[in-house]
Amino acid sequence: TPFSHGITKRIINEDLSAFEYVFCWLGNTDLLVSIIKLIEDKMNLEHDVQEVGVQLILLVEDGIRFYSSILPNLYKFVLKQSQEFSTEALNAHQRTLRMRGRPKIVLARTYQEAMEIYHKYQNNILGVITDVRFPKVERGEKDGLAGIKLCAEIRKNDPFVPLIIQSSESENSSYAVKYGCLLYTSDAADE
């Protein structure tokens, strides 16, 4: 594959603090738009939430290959929905406002980062998509149930926010039922 597990393991031991995000090229040109949108969303998030009440989708994933493949699809869906919604506007100014008011997508790579984002923006969370296994803190060991713990904590505060758990292990379905989550299983989840 273009971004092997060997490369992923080498990156883990590197100091990447100078970089906001690391992506892998999987041949999808939509990744470039996703990178730009992700950075724009992060930069504009606080202003857009406070001033306009924009909602956000929280994606919790530490797998570079996985978030490099899901973000283009997620952005394509959100942008398409926003374009369709903006056609209902009465004039050009309203259309522009509706497009700018699209849900922001925020990527968290640890439990701690996800909880900080959740607590700061919990009234504007449109939904959460989470992996099951990721570190609790930056550069920490992976916790095999971090995503489940995240869903449990969020569910305590909000019984209605949509939660999606993505996992390569169907055994996690009992957790999904317990916390009222949708479980998406795939054989291609990144380690």
Can you annotate each of these PLM segments?
Residues 6-11, 72-73, 136-146:
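Short, flexible/disordered intra-domain loops and linkers
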Residues 53-65, 70-94, 105:
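Conserved acidic segment of CheY-like receiver
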Residues 1-9, 20-24, 61, 126-129, ...:
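A short, hydrophobic beta-strand element within the central beta-sheet of small alpha/beta folds
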Residues 116, 137-160:
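Short amphipathic alpha-helix used as the core "switch/output" element in two-component signaling
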Residues 3-5, 29, 63-67, 112-114, ...:
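Short acidic, S/G/P-rich loop/turn micro-motifs used as interaction or catalytic elements
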Residues 184-190:
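Conserved small/polar residues in nucleotide/adenosyl-binding loops
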Residues 11, 16-21, 26-46, 73, ...:
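Receiver (REC) domain switch/output surface
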